[in-house]
Amino acid sequence: MCFMTFFNGEKPILFPDITYSFYDVWAEEFRIPYETQPLDDDFNIRKEDYYKENGGVIFPNPNAPTGVEASQEMIEDILQHNQDVIVIIDEAYVDFGAETALPLLEKYDNLIVVQTFSKSRSMAGMRIGYAMASPELIKYLNDVKYSFNSYTMDQTALDLGVASIDDQAYFEETLHKIIQTRERVKLRLTELGFTFRDSKSNFIFASHKSCPAEELFEKLKEKDIYVRYFKKPRIDNYLRITIGTDAEMDEFLSEVEKYLKETGRL
């Protein structure tokens, strides 16, 4: 919806080269020119790359698939250098430990912060998402939504969304469990020889020092354990490991350890 509403000029929009996989899909679908900006070797945004003339900026924070968080200082710097275009911060995973950019809405009328119920509230099938921005930008979004919205919500979805917000205790308890498990898994992965950047999401983007990611991905798949492998430049030796229950993660870690020992890598 934001792409349709705000990214309709002749100048290219900017987003990272390693990012949510649908940004380029939407840009191509709506014939929006775009340029990807390379993250640095630690998967951080290089703010200077966004100083150039452009038709808009969008990036996820924390990043998907890396889980790396951009600081609020960096986000504000990008906003200061892009006050004539729309800047969208995609906070799909923000509840898992990252800092929201919402306070910056008071200072920047060109900022849009989007969030979703699909991740931290486990309601992907309900298709509930929302944007927060100045009244003027929300009006423009509504104008397009009432004409072209393909993600309409029925009363059941709306009722479930309200129930999710009302049960804040369960929401916070679930987040705490996921974060706690994530930190435990990170420690064990380090012991097993993996490296990764600090994740502020519900997944870990990890690479092993001697076991190729694709090889481990295929081995885990044989055991009906599914992690995400990206056969793309720069990240083709990483696995995105989503945090499940403690029992699921114990099984995952056990199979990884077993395979590393069998192949003489541990």
Task: Give the location of each predicted region.
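Phosphate-binding glycine-rich loop
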Residues: 1-12, 210
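Conserved PLP-binding catalytic core of the aspartate aminotransferase-like
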Residues: 179, 191-223, 239
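PLP-dependent enzyme catalytic core of the Aspartate aminotransferase-like
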Residues: 73, 218-223, 228, 232-266
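Active-site phosphate-binding strand-loop segment of PLP-dependent enzymes
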Residues: 40-95
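PLP-dependent aminotransferase class I/II
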Residues: 110-190, 194-197
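Short beta->alpha connector loops at strand-helix junctions that form conserved
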Residues: 17, 36-40, 115, 230-231
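A short helix->loop->beta-strand "cap" motif at the edges of active sites that frequently abuts
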Residues: 11, 32, 82-86
